[in-house]
């Protein structure tokens, strides 16, 4: 079985105006995460080279904040062009919040392959985890990305206190979008966050992967944040459950599995790594 590996570069971190209860980058909570307006292009390129060395096909340029403005758009485009020049075989993904069709077309021109903007959860449950913007505005950005000609990466976070009905509603909304890839994150509580709920267990997490693949058979199911903590020694069972991709290395503000450890284990299990996108 061939799987896709993706890596993340947090190129603008923290001080986000939004009040998403699951996120340590929100200015509404006090955390000790690194905060910076922009990462040096040379550092982004270095991280891209490391990602490629670690068998990654996807490389995601992530910025904190509600969405794109002119300055941030220019910066993400600069970063994309810099990475493309030095590491031409990576598929570039942008994750920059709300964006118009015109802004997304500019990203595509700069070499962005796919846009990631998660719905996070169901339309019904969303107001309980965020009050500073609407679920509908997130959905619209995904429609904008498709109109701009970008591939779509859209998923969300499980284990925030949502019901089984919420999960079903959430997946129905994803079915409307039919994303190229759909990331699954498992919420891990942080003492500084307002959201304090029991952690999912491994059986629940694997059921979520199975249910997602059943709902979205044509999408690449990607297991991302929380994989190591929630699934522990069972984390590689995700592929039997229907996953076709994982995020390797660190996440936005939390540590991930060392890329080399993932690669060693996956090779031992007989997996190969995608080097192009079908």
UniProtKB/Swiss-Prot annotation:
Its EC number is 2.8.1.6. One of its GO terms (molecular function) is 2 iron, 2 sulfur cluster binding. Pfam families: BATS (PF06968), Radical_SAM (PF04055). It is an enzyme of class 2 (transferase). The keyword Iron-sulfur applies. GO terms for biological process: biotin biosynthetic process. Its cofactor is [4Fe-4S] cluster; [2Fe-2S] cluster. Keywords: 2Fe-2S, 4Fe-4S, Biotin biosynthesis, Iron, Iron-sulfur, Metal-binding, S-adenosyl-L-methionine, Transferase. Pathway: Cofactor biosynthesis; biotin biosynthesis; biotin from 7,8-diaminononanoate: step 2/2. Residues 1-227 form the Radical SAM core domain. [4Fe-4S] cluster binds at residues 16, 20, 23. It comes from the Bacteria. [2Fe-2S] cluster binds at residues 60, 95, 153. Binds 1 [4Fe-4S] cluster. The cluster is coordinated with 3 cysteines and an exchangeable S-adenosyl-L-methionine. SUPFAM superfamilies: Radical SAM enzymes. Belongs to the radical SAM superfamily. Biotin synthase family. NCBIfam families: bioB (TIGR00433), PRK08508.1 (NF006308). Homodimer. Catalyzes the conversion of dethiobiotin (DTB) to biotin by the insertion of a sulfur atom into dethiobiotin via a radical-based mechanism. This is Biotin synthase. The gene is bioB.
């Amino acid at each position: 079985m061939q799987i896709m590996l993706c890596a993340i570069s947090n190129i603008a971190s923290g001080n986000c105006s939004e009040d998403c209860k699951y996120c340590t980058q929100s200015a509404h909570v006090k955390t000790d995460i690194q905060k910076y307006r922009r990462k040096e292009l040379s550092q982004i390129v270095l991280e891209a080279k490391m990602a490629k060395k670690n068998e990654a096909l996807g490389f995601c340029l992530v910025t904190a904040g509600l969405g794109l403005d002119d300055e941030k758009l220019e910066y993400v485009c600069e970063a994309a062009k810099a990475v493309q020049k030095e590491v031409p075989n990576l598929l570039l993904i942008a994750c920059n919040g709300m964006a118009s069709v015109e802004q997304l077309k500019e990203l595509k021109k700069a070499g962005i392959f796919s846009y990631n903007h998660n719905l996070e959860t169901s339309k019904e449950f969303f107001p309980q985890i965020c009050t500073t913007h609407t679920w509908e505005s997130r959905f619209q950005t995904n429609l904008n990305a498709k109109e701009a000609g970008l591939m779509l990466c859209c998923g969300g976070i499980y284990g925030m206190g949502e019901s089984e009905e919420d999960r079903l509603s959430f997946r129905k909304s994803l079915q409307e979008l039919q994303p190229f890839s759909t990331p699954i994150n498992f919420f891990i509580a942080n003492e500084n966050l307002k959201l304090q709920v029991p952690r999912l267990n491994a059986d629940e997490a694997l059921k979520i992967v199975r249910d997602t693949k059943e709902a979205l058979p044509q999408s690449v199911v990607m297991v991302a944040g929380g994989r190591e903590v929630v699934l522990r020694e069972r984390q590689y069972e995700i592929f039997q459950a229907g996953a076709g991709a994982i995020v390797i290395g660190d996440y936005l503000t939390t540590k991930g599995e060392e890329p080399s450890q993932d690669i060693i284990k996956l090779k031992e299990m007989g997996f190969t790594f995608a080097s192009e996108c079908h």
